[in-house]
C-alpha cells in the first residue's frame, strides 16, 4: 500500500470494481484520461486545495487566521506555483530533473519540498545527480524539505551521505518544545522507511521523547509514540522483543 504509486490511475469501475487494471497507459482511453485529468486539476484550482502543503505548513502558514483564509491569499499560498512544482515532482520523466534541482532553490518552502520529493521519487540515479543540492537541503530552513532530502540520501546515496541523512532524521525526530509534532512525525516515518540503514543510531532512536513537544492540538500527540515504537519494532528493538 505504501509503495510508490503510478503518476495517474484510471479504472473502469463497471468492469473492474476492484481497481486492478490501470488504464492510464491504454491508448484507447487517452481521451477519457485527459477529460478526467482536466476535471481533477480544475477542481484543485477552484478550491485551492491545501493538500499540496506539508501538513505542518498548513498550520504554520495560517497562524493568526484560518487554513481556508490562508489558502485564498496568494501571498501566503501561491497555489499555481506550488501546484506546478507538485505536478513536475509526481511525473516520472527524467527530463524534469534540472527543473527539480532548480525548485530546490526556490524562495517558497513548498516548492523546495516538491523539488526534493521529485528527486526522491526518481530514485538512485536522480539522487546521485542531485547529491550536492540534497546535501545543501539538509540545512534548509524548512524542516519538511530537510526530511525529504535526508530520506533521499539515506535511501539512495553512498555510505557517508546515508549517515548524514539518518543523523538529520534522528535530529528532526526529537519532538520537543522547539520541534513541532508534524516534523517529528515526518522524520520518524522517513526513518522507518530506511530500515537497517538507521540501525547505527538505534540507541538515539530508543531515547527519543514520546511526548511534551510542540503541537497545535492534543489529538496529534499519540502518533509520535506509535511511530517510535514502530521504528524500534522494525529494527528488532521494541520493548520485550528479542533481537
Residue ranges and their predicted role:
Residues 1-7, 13-15, 23-132, 136-169, ...:
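Long, internal low-complexity/basic segments
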